Amino acid sequence: MSIPAHLQILQPSELEALKKLQDELPKILEKTDYNEMYGHKLSEAEDGPGKAYSEVKRDIILLKFLKARDYDIAQTKDMLTDALKWRKEFDPLDCASAKHDSKFDKLGVITDKGAGGEPQVTNWNLYGAVSNRKEIFGDLKGFLRWRVGIMERSLALLDFTKPGAGSMLLQIHDYKNVSFLRLDAETKAASKETIRVFQSYYPETLERKFFVNVPTLMQFVFGFVNKFLSRETVAKFVVYSNGKDLHKSLGSWVPAEYGGKGGPLLEMAISDHPVQEAETKETKEKEKETEKPVGTSETDTVGDAAEPAPTEPAAETVPTTEPAPTEPAAETAPTESSTAPSAEPAAETAEPVSEGAKVAAQ
């Protein structure tokens, strides 16, 4: 029996783990009474939200959870079950399409093009635009639904028929004008809850994470934290003290303010509702498919199989004294300022890091 292209990179033990999870999936879906992950159905059931079922997309998503739990079936089942329960209750797809409070408008941007105009989904988190932390982070429910909405809108643009980078996004945290000397209760609470959500429910969704315009003081903290994180996690983080150095890692397509030749960031941003746009595009493609002459077909296969997602679960940080230490991401940048911590750090790293940051600040 031949191995599908999207699974050929896997080791025999990993293939076996995936097969076991596939066999357990119907029970998990029945238990949670939910069938959608990142906008895609995990079974052929027609009811409920999500795009049409595809075995390839299902496998790519399952591999993210397996990778995050080192292919331990019991732990993966628990993580997947918890994520499905959370999605049913929290309704992240609604977060993606909802109109959020205008106070969040300037905090996040999504772009979908990279070098040479090639597809590259990137989250830009502009925490320097926060003028009133208590107003933004004090509204914990509103902030979290907005932040989850940004993530879901980004995931809707990814290609879940491709393992590795094709089904992952870049994330840039810009800390320009952010003060790390104060840590109010609202900001700390927002940071901890966002970290928990992204670590628990969005494993292996970040290819790399960049922290730019980071004060030298915080770089010292990042370097210290690196010693306690896995190589896979550290390999995802890149830290730059000067935002204009970002082009060294990503190329000239980034905006001029980040050292590239691209236009203003806000002009590069996609529309507010890419989820609907993606669904419309998929509908049109299906209509074209039905118009094809008999004998032609397209299969949901993968070309060159890439490496499945990295190992650490995805985490998130807010502009507090604990920014970098809470997220996973990519290879350290080729500059002296790029001693970054890991990609999607585990929740337990959040607190120690923030404490280290406070001590350093003092």
UniProtKB/Swiss-Prot annotation:
Compartmental location: Cytoplasm; Endoplasmic reticulum membrane; Microsome membrane
Biased composition range(s): Basic and acidic residues: 275-292
Protein residues bound to heme: Y127, R147, H173, Y175, K209
Domain CRAL-TRIO residues, every copy: 102-266
Cellular component, GO annotation: cortical endoplasmic reticulum; cytosol; endoplasmic reticulum membrane; plasma membrane
Database matches in Pfam families: CRAL_TRIO (PF00650), CRAL_TRIO_N (PF03765)
Catalytic activity: a 1,2-diacyl-sn-glycero-3-phospho-(1D-myo-inositol)(in) = a 1,2-diacyl-sn-glycero-3-phospho-(1D-myo-inositol)(out)
Sample GO molecular function, one term: phosphatidylinositol transfer activity
UniProt keyword Cytoplasm, yes or no: yes
Residue ranges, compositional bias (Low complexity): 305-355
Alphabetized InterPro entries for the sequence: CRAL-TRIO_dom (IPR001251), CRAL-TRIO_dom_sf (IPR036865), CRAL/TRIO_N_dom (IPR011074), CRAL/TRIO_N_dom_sf (IPR036273), Sfh5 (IPR042938)
Topology within the bilayer: Peripheral membrane protein
Function, in words: Non-classical phosphatidylinositol (PtdIns) transfer protein (PITP), which exhibits PtdIns-binding/transfer activity in the absence of detectable PtdCho-binding/transfer activity. Regulates PtdIns(4,5)P2 homeostasis at the plasma membrane. Heme-binding protein that may play a role in organic oxidant-induced stress responses.
Name of the protein described by the UniProt record: Phosphatidylinositol transfer protein SFH5
